[in-house]
Amino acid sequence: MAVKIKLTRLGKIRNPQYRVIVADARTRRDGRSIEVIGRYHPKEEPSLIDINSERTQYWLSVGAKPTEPVLKLLKITGDWQKFKGLPGAEGRLKVAPPKPSKLELFNAALAVADGGPTTEATRPKKKVSAKKAAKAVESDAEGAKATKAYALAEGDEQSE
């Protein structure tokens, strides 16, 4: 059986993302695969190329042939040079700088703000009408009576 290492397409219309797979040469592009050995996101800066080197070396050693796009990716990661015994096996893969954590960003913004807002609110707070305030006080009083009655009922049940 002829085996190829090729790309299957994932993602949205203008945001392609690929999986690097090992599949029978006769299967269609997004068809059934034998094994997924990596992923490739070309739209990120720098492009994300994540290929399992150990599994790639195994499949190349048993005769799997990479397609042209995959061959370029393997040369970037250094897997092709490692397989062929050529110099440059370390590859020339660019690594993205690590993103700061959200906690660090929050603490930095808090330090800039000196722990509090520097300006007043842009909209004045709405004034509560007298009727709504009276209703709120009444509902609070009713709620307190209900909880007191419930507590008394609980006490009666426990004493029995």
From Swiss-Prot:
Q: Which Gene3D superfamilies match?
A: 3.30.1320.10
Under the heading InterPro entries, the entry gives:
Ribosomal_bS16, Ribosomal_bS16_CS, Ribosomal_bS16_dom_sf
- Residue ranges of region Disordered? 115-139
Annotated family: Belongs to the bacterial ribosomal protein bS16 family.
Q: Could you give a GO molecular-function term held by this entry?
A: structural constituent of ribosome
Pfam family for this entry, one: Ribosomal_S16
Q: Where is the composition biased (Basic residues)?
A: 124-134
Record-level GO BP terms:
translation
Is Ribosomal protein included in the keywords of this UniProt record? yes
Q: What is this protein called?
A: Small ribosomal subunit protein bS16
Q: Which SUPFAM superfamilies match?
A: Ribosomal protein S16
Q: Name one GO cellular component term.
A: cytoplasm
The alphabetized UniProt keywords are: Ribonucleoprotein, Ribosomal protein
